[in-house]
Amino acid sequence: MNQSDNLGFFRTKTVFNQLGLYFSVSLGLLLMALPASAHHMMGEKVPTNFFQGFMSGIAHPLIGFDHFAFIFSVGLLAAVQKRGMFISIAFVVASMLGAGAHLATFNLSGVELGVSASVLLFGILLTLKNRPNTATIVGLSAIAGLFHGYAYGESIFGAETTPLLAYLLGFTVIQLVVTMTVFSLSKKFLSGEAQLPIGRSAGLVLSGMGLAFLASAIANVIFPLPKG
């Protein structure tokens, strides 16, 4: 491939990166306009048995687009950082603690803002060539996990012990599955010279989504929707 072809390739890639960013921002705004019940597999109903609890736990991180985007970013960062597996572990453990804090009626303010900001932050981290060390990112992942877990706890608050434990098991399992799948695929494809440009492209998309999520969360704080 000659120099002219290289320039054409990078220009095309830049255009697609920008289009992906603009598209993700628009998509994020549309998704965040959905009602809060979109994060609940059973709407506003509390699970009453093991199966309902487990399936609700699996569904919440998948149908909550802000949660899924962050879990995806955790898997990507874990793949490109040295000893990055600890980033995933810290998030999963902290999310369980966050859910437990909610169930224990501990008050954590700004949960939606924290969840949205975490997507933006990890998207930005993916775009950086010189990232903070793994220990710092592990700490950030744990803090984010507390916010995400606290948000998960809202769906199961008031449930009996069996569906509650099943719910905790469900969202823990699905988070591990998603992060490990992204981690494994990224380890395979994000290697050598491909790591930086592909990682940056993914980071731009996630940053765009995070920005959209955060803008919507701020708007909901300033102009809260009426309940009922």
Segments predicted by a language model, with ranges:
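Divalent metal-coordination and catalytic microenvironments
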Residues: 38, 64-67, 120, 146-148, ...
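Generic transmembrane alpha-helix signature in multi-pass membrane proteins
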Residues: 68-78, 126, 137-145, 151-160
